[in-house]
Amino acid sequence: MAAVLVDAGPMVAVFGARQPRAKHYLDLFKKAADMNWSLSTTLPCVVEASYLLAPPQRYTFLRWVGAGALSVFPFQQEMLDEFVGLMQRYTEAPRTEMDLADASLVWLASDTGVTTIMTTDVRDFSRYRLPDGRGFDIL
């Protein structure tokens, strides 16, 4: 079974109204279901997607997550220091800025070894590296 991390962007694309690339990500989510992929995200990604979606899509999205469509990894408060370290490492103002959701996914990839990711942030995730130097395989 394949394991895939999911960023907020693809979830917003699928659940948002008239979003660009919605079909691409809808097809990927269908493929994930058909092939029994293990989909994982983090609470910051769920919060970001929820914030970007308007009602009633927001409610549909949260019910989808609540029904177990993907695993939501929690983190301990102490991990925020690690996230800040990642954010500082990858922020080059004013050009680029790593947000909390991205930092949480890089941390999750490092913790689990999963480097395949669904994201609309291709430019950013092409730059991010795990401590062992591995990059991300972007779907």
Residue ranges of model-derived segments:
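PIN-domain endoribonuclease scaffold, especially VapC-family toxins
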Residues: 2-4, 23-97, 103, 107, ...
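Metal-dependent nucleic-acid phosphoesterase active-site entry motif
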Residues: 1-20
